[in-house]
Swiss-Prot record:
Belongs to the Hfq family. Residues 9-68 form the Sm domain. The gene is hfq. This is RNA-binding protein Hfq. Homohexamer. PROSITE patterns: SM.
């Protein structure tokens, strides 16, 4: 739970608090849209016309409609500026920070 949660929680909390519309892409390619109503260790509750419980293991990407400030006193360590938060990167496929893990 350590490092992964320290990035996820502040990011998802900021999206929830500020009611930022998000697009959530699932691993099977389906795109869901709405606002994050709530979340826990395993699921995100996404609200649009209905509420949907989306399991985190099925999520590929969460893309906010606008940038959000999600830093909570550097809880995630490191610089924090390399964290991808959907800043309208059209066509730019910037490598992940840990590029040796992606292929």
């Amino acid at each position: 739970m350590a490092k992964g949660q320290s990035l996820q929680d502040p990011f998802l909390n900021a999206l929830r608090r500020e009611r930022v519309p998000v697009s959530i892409y699932l691993v099977n390619g389906i795109k869901l849209q709405g606002q994050i109503e709530s979340f826990d260790q395993f699921v995100i509750l996404l609200k649009n016309t209905v509420s949907q419980m989306v399991y985190k293991h099925a999520i590929s990407t969460v893309v906010p409609s606008r940038p959000v400030s999600h830093h909570s006193n550097n809880a995630g360590g490191g610089t924090g500026s390399n964290f991808h938060h959907g800043s309208n990167a059209q066509g730019s496929s910037a490598p992940a920070q840990d590029s040796d893990e992606t292929e």
